[in-house]
Amino acid sequence: MAEAILAVRGGLGAKSRLAAVFSDAERAALVEAMLLDMLDALAGAGAGAVRRVWVVTPTERLERLAAAAGARVIREPRPAGLNAAFRCGLAAAAEEAPYADIVLLPGDLPTLRAQDVDAALLLLRTHDLVLALASRDGGTGLLAVRAGVPFTPQFGAQSCARHRRQARARGLSCALVEAGSLALDLDRPEDAVEVARGPCGRRTAEVLSDLKSRWRAQ
């Protein structure tokens, strides 16, 4: 069974690249909606696939929401970036489940589907590392690591290539999982339009409903 770690930052300053589309309050609500939709998706993963979900966040409200949804929460004292958040989550998970597989997910995948997580974990049975390529910037939508395999998260733009280089340097077998729900992170206005056009989590769809109206009016 795997330990899933989500890293997410909320509050009024979250998702600043969406400021042209959403107000501060709307962006904060969007982050909350995406987190809860992702937790729902992970809860629907195949029997025994995900043992526990950890949420790493510096945001008090997200801490409360994640805990109420049944996640284990690690509260960061201050925002320190995505990779620092994942390192924090990895350390905590290693203490409680040192022999578990690990799945790292940024908290902005509003179309996440349980079956795509299952597909990644199925590949992990025969590989040391599984990656999902983000569609727009070459980033990483998912990073899954087999139990006991040493690996350092390097999320960010073009990070999928960095992760693959690190795997080669360490002599690790690596597979790519092709899944649309792991490729679309909602970070820019054009991402919001794409998510609004298709199926996504219920809460995210509600927050995006106003954007849909604006888009149709154009």
UniProtKB/Swiss-Prot annotation:
| One annotated GO molecular function | phospholactate guanylyltransferase activity
Entry keyword set: GTP-binding, Nucleotide-binding, Nucleotidyltransferase, Transferase
GO-annotated biological processes = F420-0 metabolic process
What Pfam families does UniProt report for this protein, alphabetically?
Answer: CofC
- For the keyword GTP-binding, the answer is yes
EC assignment: 2.7.7.106
| Pathway(s) served | Cofactor biosynthesis; coenzyme F420 biosynthesis
Tagged with keyword Nucleotide-binding: yes
Give, as one word, the top-level EC class.
Answer: transferase
User: Would you say which domain of life the source belongs to?
Assistant: Bacteria
Q: Which reaction does it catalyse?
A: (2R)-3-phosphoglycerate + GTP + H(+) = 3-[(R)-glyceryl]-diphospho-5'-guanosine + diphosphate
List residues traversing the bilayer: none
What's its job?
Guanylyltransferase that catalyzes the activation of (2R)-3-phosphoglycerate (3PG) as 3-[(R)-glyceryl]-diphospho-5'-guanosine, via the condensation of 3PG with GTP. It is involved in the biosynthesis of a derivative of the hydride carrier cofactor coenzyme F420, 3PG-F420.
Q: Give the record's family classification.
A: Belongs to the CofC family.
What name goes with this protein?
3-phospho-D-glycerate guanylyltransferase
